[in-house]
């Protein structure tokens, strides 16, 4: 009874692996990437450039663009893009159009993102959430919709970099909210453009050492948030809460942040070059072994574990 089942599972796994390894022929197709100043975007731009793709890399800052151009080949071109600015998006789209011409755009990688304030939700304002959503959710949506005609022209691919925290909201602030939103947009888009030959993949990295996870920046941002709180709210939590919270955050980040960004880049490259790209990729050991399994557990259990890990406010009622 069990032997046929086991053989069936092994056969399915073998066929899946064979299918997953099938690649498209080598290509010099055009790939547009956002957020190439540093981190995942910069690494991917350089790796695709080395593989012969014609990379159109957008950066937020002139220094980021100049630094990338300096170490890349002549095939790679850079432009400036602020994904929160509709006018900047329109200018970038025109720039892309002049490069791709009749060939269209084969790949769009929405990588630009920010962390915002990572901390208790009651400390934050609507504007705090808005700033993160503008970059992490509305930005990719705006860029994707603007470039969609060029992607349809080439029967191309959209790869949205979300986060494993788009599957499990482990902390307060706009980051998790923004990534959940981008996940939903990606799922809807995938179904809507599939009839036209456009493929959509989601890459949900675990914790990696990038500017988004820079501890000094995260701590400075949270301390500034604490400093602006009304005295009544500060009294509710107590002075010791912030110190303990930052200590826990530091311990977790030092323990699980992976310095090997190539794990993410390999997933992005597979999504662009595989004949059958996956719907979702989850690079990082913490994504596979911690966050994704936890996302399927009962909410009460996850809440209890997080309550045990994080410090309690001074005036807690339990």
Swiss-Prot record:
Annotated active site: 175
Pathway involvement of the protein, from the record: Cofactor metabolism; retinol metabolism
Function: Catalyzes the oxidation of cis-isomers of retinol, including 11-cis-, 9-cis-, and 13-cis-retinol in an NAD-dependent manner. Has no activity towards all-trans retinal. Plays a significant role in 11-cis retinol oxidation in the retinal pigment epithelium cells (RPE). Also recognizes steroids (androsterone, androstanediol) as its substrates.
Residues passing through the membrane, by range: 1-23, 289-309
Main location: endoplasmic reticulum
UniProt enzyme class: oxidoreductase
Identification of the protein by name: Retinol dehydrogenase 5
Keywords: Endoplasmic reticulum, Lipid metabolism, Membrane, Microsome, NAD, Oxidoreductase, Sensory transduction, Steroid metabolism, Transmembrane, Transmembrane helix, Vision
Residues in compartment: Cytoplasmic: 310-318
UniProt organism field: Bos taurus
Family matches, as Gene3D superfamilies: NAD(P)-binding Rossmann-like Domain (3.40.50.720)
Pfam family for this entry, one: adh_short
Organism superkingdom: Eukaryota
Activation/inhibition comment: Inhibited by 9-cis-, 13-cis- and all-trans-retinoic acids, with the most potent inhibitor being 13-cis-retinoic acid. Weakly inhibited by oleic acid.
């Amino acid at each position: 009874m069990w032997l046929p089942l086991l053989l069936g599972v092994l056969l399915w796994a073998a066929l899946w692996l064979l299918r997953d390894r099938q690649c498209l022929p080598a290509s010099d197709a055009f790939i547009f990437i956002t957020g190439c100043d540093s981190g995942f975007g910069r690494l991917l731009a350089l790796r695709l450039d080395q593989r012969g793709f014609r990379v159109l890399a957008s950066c937020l800052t002139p220094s980021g663009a100049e630094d990338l151009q300096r170490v890349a080949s002549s095939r790679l071109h850079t432009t400036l893009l602020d994904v929160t600015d509709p006018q900047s998006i329109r200018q970038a789209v025109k720039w892309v159009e002049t490069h791709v011409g009749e060939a269209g755009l084969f790949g769009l990688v929405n990588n630009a993102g920010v962390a915002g304030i990572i901390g208790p939700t009651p400390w934050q304002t609507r504007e705090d959430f808005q700033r993160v959503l503008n970059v992490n959710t509305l930005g990719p949506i705006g860029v994707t919709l603007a470039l969609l005609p060029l992607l349809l022209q080439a029967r191309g691919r959209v790869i949205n970099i979300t986060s494993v925290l788009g599957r499990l909201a482990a902390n307060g602030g706009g980051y998790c909210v923004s990534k959940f939103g981008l996940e939903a947009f990606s799922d809807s888009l995938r179904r809507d453009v599939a009839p036209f030959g456009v493929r959509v993949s989601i890459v949900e990295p675990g914790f990696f050492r990038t500017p988004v996870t820079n501890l000094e920046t995260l701590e400075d941002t949270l301390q500034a948030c604490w400093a602006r709180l009304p005295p009544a709210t500060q009294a509710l939590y107590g002075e010791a809460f912030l110190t303990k919270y930052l200590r826990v955050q530091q311990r977790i980040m030092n323990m699980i942040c992976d310095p090997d960004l190539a794990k993410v880049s390999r997933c992005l490259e597979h999504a662009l070059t595989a004949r059958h790209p996956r719907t979702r990729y989850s690079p990082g050991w913490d994504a596979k072994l911690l966050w994704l399994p936890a996302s399927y557990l009962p909410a009460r259990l996850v809440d209890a574990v997080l309550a045990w890990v994080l410090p309690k406010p001074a005036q807690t009622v339990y």
